[in-house]
């Protein structure tokens, strides 16, 4: 089946392997209640109940009932832990499941021995069994893991909500104009679908009829409704607000925005950062630490008291209280929450390492056009320098060449020329001049569009006073050359984004230096930089110059973040310690960029830094808890404070172990963007 032609969102739910027991999630709830039925009579018939109550539930042969029920409980209720431990050993990564499996196995096997000694041996005295402890241990473990898996599942909740945004069906407009409700999986590219007010838009597409306002808050985090007119793009999963629209489908299945986002997030969550690799290693050592401490505590208490029941209880408690799981989940749970929140707000984290690196960023380098400014240019001035050519002829020549480019400056010139009703032609042999402009043939004459740097480098004469006047007003200026003569010019202005000023101020408050990198001329660059409060400016750059500048800053030991276009600035984004591709829109699969910002909003740079800070704080909290819990709990379980009467039973150990993981999960779930 070709997924590029079919929509499939039935299986969007992410599959994160947070632990070796993730696949038992559905079993824990059922197993807990079934095990409870077996555990109640075991507990009621135990000698412990006779000590605590004025009457006993025991009857002749009740010890056999306890044995049979305990055996069923061990193999049924204990199965997730026994099979989980087996899987961990097979993978040569023994951890929490192996410890629990060892604990309940020791309790069960010793209880079998005690049952034999009490019923079939001629030895005098009574050997205490652990059937009561075994029952409570398995019950608490099942309950704890059921609660834990619910908490773990909530960590990636934002991503699951995204998966549920797409409807199951859509209204397809047939060739004969009839409307027909079809499954999403039957929708193909170029189909026309109709979406009424209040409905979820089923696929990515282009509006071909109607206009509306669209709520993208659940898709990109855009809080305000976005006005959409004919020929505007819409994203599948966003909510159609005010009018009925018809949408031509542009992407389905894995090519759709939501599918791409969830694919990138899943990939990021499966990759391990250096901090996670370290916590995994420590969690792995913790297994051996717990086993060694458990065995030593058994030997020491046998030497001190010669009481096998007490010594064995210490061993079992150590095995069940140690929780490499809390340490192992400390980072993955925060990551799941962080990447999901990011995706929900239009911040796609492709490289998790960048979240850690962001704590140490010294410089944020930004392209001017489209990042700090709107990138929507307006033509403010155009002029002919040749007596026999009118201003409109110059405009026509500019538009003819620029019609072959998709650069924002080019699009602005073409649109302006059309609005002036000035005609232009299709040129021949148009070539891009990197970092300069274009050249091509019009009516068998060669024309070049260049910047002022090209004129200076090649000794062309031009009106420098006019250039300075227009440039200081913030205009980008292009020149037209024919037969080694400058015959005309055009000046285009760009607006600074409202949020750029605040973003620069926020960077400075964080002691991060903003740097402007632009191919535009010095005058324009410094005019924009001055208004924004940026003092570090590099102008008139070729594409390769940006990469070189980043390298120079890094050579002094600085950490550099680069923000720019995911395609044109690809080398710079790759060179930087963190590359942020801004304004990706629905094309979130751009190759370069550790972080993808769906919107062209400079505020999202600060949002990423805030998310990074909050994420790292939660990771550190969880690591301290995971490590600190084990450092304190294991010696307590071994009986380190038994001399003052503080002794933990296996049941209490099981409760503490389950709680330790639940606390880590809840702490991860409290992570917020702001």
Curated annotation (Swiss-Prot):
Pfam families: E1-E2_ATPase, Hydrolase. The chain crosses the membrane at residues 32-52, 57-77, 95-115, 127-147, 284-304, 315-335, 623-645, 649-671. Belongs to the cation transport ATPase (P-type) (TC 3.A.3) family. Type IB subfamily. Keywords: ATP-binding, Cell membrane, Copper, Copper transport, Ion transport, Magnesium, Membrane, Metal-binding, Nucleotide-binding, Phosphoprotein, Translocase, Transmembrane, Transmembrane helix, Transport. It is a multi-pass membrane protein. It is found in: Cell membrane. The active site is at residue 367. CDD domains: P-type_ATPase_Cu-like. Mg(2+) binds at residues 565, 569. GO terms for biological process: copper ion homeostasis. It catalyses: Cu(+)(in) + ATP + H2O = Cu(+)(out) + ADP + phosphate + H(+). One of its GO terms (cellular component) is plasma membrane. InterPro entries: ATPase_P-typ_cyto_dom_N, ATPase_P-typ_P_site, ATPase_P-typ_TM_dom_sf, ATPase_P-typ_transduc_dom_A_sf, HAD-like_sf, HAD_sf, P-typ_ATPase_IB, P_typ_ATPase. Its EC number is 7.2.2.8. The keyword NADP does not apply. This is Probable copper-transporting P-type ATPase B. GO terms for molecular function: ATP binding; ATP hydrolysis activity; copper ion binding; P-type divalent copper transporter activity; P-type monovalent copper transporter activity. Residues 1-20 are annotated as: Disordered. It comes from Staphylococcus haemolyticus (strain JCSC1435). Involved in copper transport.
